[in-house]
Amino acid sequence: MIKVTLKDGKVMEFENTTTPGDVAKAISPGLYKKAISAKINGKRAELMTNIDKDCNLEILTFDDEDGKWTLRHTASHILAQAIKRLYPEAKLAIGPAIDSGFYYDIDADFSFTEEMFAKIEKEMNKIIKENLKLERFELPREKAIEYMEEKKEPYKVELIKDLPEDAVISFYKQGEFVDLCAGPHVESTAKVKVIKLMSVAGAYWRGNEKNKMLQRIYGTAFTKKADLDDYINMLEEAKKRDHRKIGKELDLFTMHEEGPGFPFFHPKGMVLKNLLLNYWREVHDKAGYDEISTPIILNEALWHQSGHWDHYKENMYFTKIDEADYAIKPMNCPGSILVYKDNIHSYRELPIKLAEIGLVHRHEKSGALHGLMRVRCFNQDDAHIFMTKEQITEEILGVIKLIDSFYKVFGFEYYVELSTRPEDSMGSDEDWEAATNGLINALNAANLEYIVNEGDGAFYGPKIDFHLKDCIGRTWQCGTIQLDFQMPERFDINYIGADGEKHRPVMVHRVVFGSIERFIGILIEHYAGAFPTWLAPVQVKVMNITDSQVEYVDAISEKLKEAGIRVEKDVRNEKIGYKIREAQLKKVPYMIVIGDKEIKEGIISVRSRKEGDLGSMNIEDFIFRINAEVKEKISSI
């Protein structure tokens, strides 16, 4: 008998070899209808995969991220098949699923345009209706190369030749179409109910600017048209909220061709950035962290010792000083370890919490750069906690609570992923098991539901990722907690235990913002530039109706400044309606209008960005209102 243990702990028994699809049918016809793919012992699998021994099984639907990924992966093959039917001379490169859908890179002697999408989509829908079964088969290396050479697919031939000697070379067939692919896929093309092509762009083969420029067609896929409609509406809203557009309109930051991927923050942007950093420092000071600062350039040998050289060197920048090789840091952890090593530590001191707003540099290909969301230099709010093994659950639980309270201030909901050991990991099986269990215990203690993301941990340890959900439903990975047994070993760091002997501490790497620049980009889009009062670079705009009120505008502005309120004056010779509209466009939370009546009665007339005309009030009541909003960090959208 084969025992299949489901996600809820229920065990089903089968006399003979079965498949996830058969298991789904046995559970209920409704589940099978919704089923997209599966996970067998935590690894992605197809509904057609044979189960011939006891296992843990999870049936995945489109509601699961891995289910979405599988369906959209098949959608990319449907796109490729449609392209080959319509344009047989086109050459296929790669076509993966991505977060928002899928793409396929194509080499053709003509340019694809969005006007051609309707024709391609029509062929894709035809392929879906044909209900073509997806069949997997394998070939030896030489046969695989010969097979793709016969099909005149040079990019596939190159991919096969670059695979390791012992690699399994698999293909997927749907009707007349065959593609080189590792899978997994859905059972048939009919599972992909709704498709839409979104855009076309240039993409260098293998992301290398020295290679040929291909054409990348982007698309997305769903199981319901209503979900596609919601997605299109979200994209339209996202365009309005684009942080690059709003950042320029509000004079927060710019990007320049003199420094691609290196943001320039303007005065108002620095106000916002410093407000976030001040809040971060306030929270971390209360939580017992000590702030440090470490150099951005360190000797290359350090990065060999840390393991970053072997795992991260392609993303690093290098320089020479006095003929010695140095690297610009891509991460803050080695510097924090050197600070820890500067002193002998007792077990009584642990945990030691060292926090740093560190400027890091990571090389990104030019095509991947995107405003503040994908840059080449950014400030990362790292903290490193050095502790005993017995303190793991308690300390990680404390970090989870800190991150939870932090995100709530900005009005974010979030979900949590546990990422496990990757293929290029360092360390023993025992250490990885202990580290992973430490994170699981803390998540359970916090009563947090989490998704397991197999094989996506850091090279030195498993991690917990926090994915923020913004007000239009998009998710952004920001906070991370990583448990590390490897770095303490590599740097030979110790503490003196109660027995007077040296012991190895456990190290936790964690961030809350992640990249502060990226977090600002997320906030701009989350609030559509209309920051809550406590974060607004300009909190109040004071404006006159005629020149006779300029002196009173100056006096009111000074009182507000003395109260710590960020204020600007608008005494231009413009109509008051124009000034109010402009302040609204600049997303200023409050506007004060000064006319003859206000001067005569010693009051101010107040307009709120959100509530409109608030009427007249005295300056003291208005200052109290602003200070209360700032103190309470009200963040309603």
Swiss-Prot record:
It is found in: Cytoplasm. One of its GO terms (biological process) is threonyl-tRNA aminoacylation. It comes from the Bacteria. Residues 242-532 are annotated as: Catalytic. It is an enzyme of class 6 (ligase). Residues 1-61 form the TGS domain. Keywords: Aminoacyl-tRNA synthetase, ATP-binding, Cytoplasm, Ligase, Metal-binding, Nucleotide-binding, Protein biosynthesis, RNA-binding, tRNA-binding, Zinc. GO terms for molecular function: ATP binding; catalytic activity, acting on a protein; metal ion binding; threonine-tRNA ligase activity; transferase activity; tRNA binding. Signal peptide: none annotated. One of its GO terms (cellular component) is cytoplasm. It catalyses: tRNA(Thr) + L-threonine + ATP = L-threonyl-tRNA(Thr) + AMP + diphosphate + H(+). Catalyzes the attachment of threonine to tRNA(Thr) in a two-step reaction: L-threonine is first activated by ATP to form Thr-AMP and then transferred to the acceptor end of tRNA(Thr). Also edits incorrectly charged L-seryl-tRNA(Thr). Homodimer. HAMAP family: Thr_tRNA_synth. This is Threonine--tRNA ligase. It comes from Clostridium acetobutylicum (strain ATCC 824 / DSM 792 / JCM 1419 / IAM 19013 / LMG 5710 / NBRC 13948 / NRRL B-527 / VKM B-1787 / 2291 / W). The gene is thrS.
